[in-house]
A protein has these predicted regions:
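Aromatic-rich, lipid-facing transmembrane alpha helices and their immediate juxtamembrane interface loops
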Residues: 1-147
């Protein structure tokens, strides 16, 4: 049933897996942000909020990639071009978002332990290189396997 649904509506497994992978990453990288010492309720709320935002960014990147390549099944097809675009879109947004939120709106701050390049955290950039590729690999191997 899941496999059939994932073929008809590939956004569902993309969104679910994106949220789960990003939530894990957000909690693991939490010590690299200045608010890490705050109370548990705050950390849960903010990290899950970020994971939800990350999932929406991935869904947007999936949608744009699907429009450009005229197929919502590009994950199953395993072509390299759509996957590279998918990752590049998320990475481009992340670069802008990290810069804007740490330099302009001051929505969050890095701890001194966060490695940075030009004021942008390297760990969030690594997140947007690793997670979309991992998501694509998992969905190709698991969700789209023929029954």
């Amino acid at each position: 049933m899941f496999r059939g649904l994932s073929r008809r509506l590939p956004e569902l497994p993309v969104a679910g897996l994106a949220f789960g992978l990003n939530a894990a990453w957000e909690f693991l990288q939490s010590p690299l942000y200045s608010d890490h010492g705050r109370e548990l309720g705050y950390l849960l709320r903010t990290r899950l909020h970020c994971a939800g935002g990350d999932a929406l960014i991935l869904l947007f990147a999936f949608g744009v990639t699907s429009l450009i390549f005229r197929s919502r099944q590009w994950l199953r097809d395993g072509r390299r071009g759509p996957t590279v675009l998918f990752v590049a879109l998320g990475l481009a947004y992340t670069i802008w978002s990290e810069w804007f939120n740490t330099q302009v709106s001051l929505s969050w701050q890095y701890a001194e332990s966060m490695p940075q390049v030009f004021g942008i955290g390297l760990i969030p950039l690594a997140q947007w290189l690793a997670i979309p590729f991992l998501l694509a690999l998992i969905l190709r191997k698991c969700a789209f396997e023929p029954t």
